[in-house]
Amino acid sequence: YKRQGTASGYSTFNSGVGFLLTYDSRDIPANAYKGIYLDFRGLMYQKFLGGDNNFYRLEVDYRQYKKVGNRKVIAWTAQTKNVFGDVPMNQYALSGTPFDLRGYYMGQYRDKSSHVVLAEYRQMFNTDKSTWVKRMLHHLGFVAWGGCGFMGPTMGKIEGVLPNAGVGLRIEVQPRMNVRLDFGRNFANDQSLFYFNMTEAF
């Protein structure tokens, strides 16, 4: 690389251009019950644009949601992130965020190609709200998910498999907006992490 790591850290400058194509039919993006989301983007980083390296990035993010009952949803996603060329280390594809493999530290695994597949069951309790206990339960719910990540130096060469599963609590603060409390398990390293957020993971 043009700039190497030093005692004070790693530094590089990237400048690029790209495109973004998005299709979104979700009813409510923050907590979808139905619909499809598809995001396809490509970026080109070049020295003639002022950056330090010549490399490319290609990402696809597909999500789908199906309502299977009253306040019950199955959601699934397939995502791929890929970089090609003279890629600086801080631009490698990575897995392990609050929005994909929950349970893995962000940046713990990175390579030139990262793929994630996840499926999640989401349910809010549905009561008649006739008592204060039932009214309280009506604002609670849970999720359970499972999936896997795959890492490698190219799209066709997988060198790391990252299984993932977890459960979560949902607290409805207003219609279709939940506080998200997730407990994710990292089976590759036998570690677990907790997450707090105001939107669903995907």
Locations of the language-model features?
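Solvent-exposed loop/turn segments connecting transmembrane beta-strands
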Residues: 11-12, 46-53, 109-113, 154-162, ...
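Conserved active-site loop/cleft motifs that coordinate metal ions or position small ligands
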Residues: 143-145, 178-184
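Conserved small/polar residues in nucleotide/adenosyl-binding loops
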Residues: 1
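Outer-membrane beta-barrel "beta-signal"
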Residues: 18, 117, 171, 190-202
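C-terminal outer-membrane beta-barrel translocator/porin domains of Gram-negative envelope proteins
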Residues: 6-10, 17-22, 26-136
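Short glycine-rich, acidic/polar surface loops and turns
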Residues: 164-169
